[in-house]
Amino acid sequence: DNNVNMPTGCVATAVSQLMYYNKWPTERPSKFVDQSGTNAQKSSVYLWNEIKDNSTQMGEVGKDAVGVLLSDVGKAVNMKYAAKGSISNMQWALDALRKNFDYSVKHISKEYMPKGMFYELVINELANGYPVLIGESSHSFLLDGIDKQGYIHVNWGWAGENDGWFDFATLYTPLDDEVFGTDIFALE
């Protein structure tokens, strides 16, 4: 039913957060512009200045802009929507960032790296001000900061629930008690 709200899905949410962080691209892919929709859907540009870190800080234009962003990204990453959860995969996220949103990104897989190198790469990206998109067996999310003690900030994509500062070396997902981070996507 097209009138039922479905979860946006972790892949679309994490990719949208990465794009919001960078405020890029400025122009929407033309294939996603809907001339029969709302003003935000008709817009050929992303309304980054209307989007805020917290939905309580946004007016209707900002909320519509978030909806458009999530919709565009959902289409680009081939989200499969369902009432109990929506899915995609990190390869589609990588393809979408490159082909639809003009990002230069690299895919790094932990399993093919010497011990400690994955950790070092993530820390370096964060220290240089670049958020890191993480994918693991059951969830995708964004690492978006590092503090002076070396703790990393995790945005799980659940409207702030469980977001916080974690010791990267011992970080577990709140979902399934598995060590996270088999794949990362970072800007090149």
Which positions does each model-derived feature cover?
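Active-site-adjacent substructure of cysteine-protease-like catalytic cores
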Residues: D95-N155
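A conserved hydrophobic secondary-structure block that centers on an alpha-helix together
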Residues: D1-M6
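Gly/Ser-rich catalytic serine loop of serine hydrolases
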Residues: P7-C10, S137-H139
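Cys-His-centered catalytic/binding microenvironment captured across papain-like cysteine peptidases
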Residues: A127, D147-E188
